[in-house]
Amino acid sequence: MASNQQLKIRIQLRSYDSSLLENSCEQIIEAAKRTDATAVGPIPLPTKKKIYCVLRSPHVDKDSREHFEIRVHRRIIDLYLPSSKTIDTLTRLDLPAGVDVEVKL
């Protein structure tokens, strides 16, 4: 039954910085093209936004508040028919420290 299905690697990338994320996506797609794997993506997923509300004053003034937000940008890349060379190339990629990578087979 597994022979009827195509082998697929799904790479999910997360980052606070969208430019780092785009550069990482380009590196992964170039590595896949060099090893003759079919790359689909990057597919942008909705950006998650967390907002934190903090009182400005340490004492009174409940009306004076400050809002901070963290945006998490996400992308998905699917690789179809990867070879062992593709997997070796992907493991040797040097991605920036601000990018979280999750790989599913």
From Swiss-Prot:
One cellular component (GO) term of this entry: ribosome
Pfam families according to UniProt: Ribosomal_S10 (PF00338)
SUPFAM superfamilies xrefs: Ribosomal protein S10
GO biological process: translation
Protein name: Small ribosomal subunit protein uS10c
Family indicated by similarity: Belongs to the universal ribosomal protein uS10 family.
Assembly notes: Part of the 30S ribosomal subunit.
Subcellular location: Plastid, Cyanelle
Claim: Plastid is one of the keywords in the record: yes
Function, as annotated: Involved in the binding of tRNA to the ribosomes.
Coiled coil segments of this chain: none
Cited InterPro entries: Ribosomal_uS10, Ribosomal_uS10_CS, Ribosomal_uS10_dom, Ribosomal_uS10_dom_sf
Organism listed in the record: Cyanophora paradoxa
One Gene Ontology molecular-function label: structural constituent of ribosome
Keywords: Cyanelle, Plastid, Ribonucleoprotein, Ribosomal protein
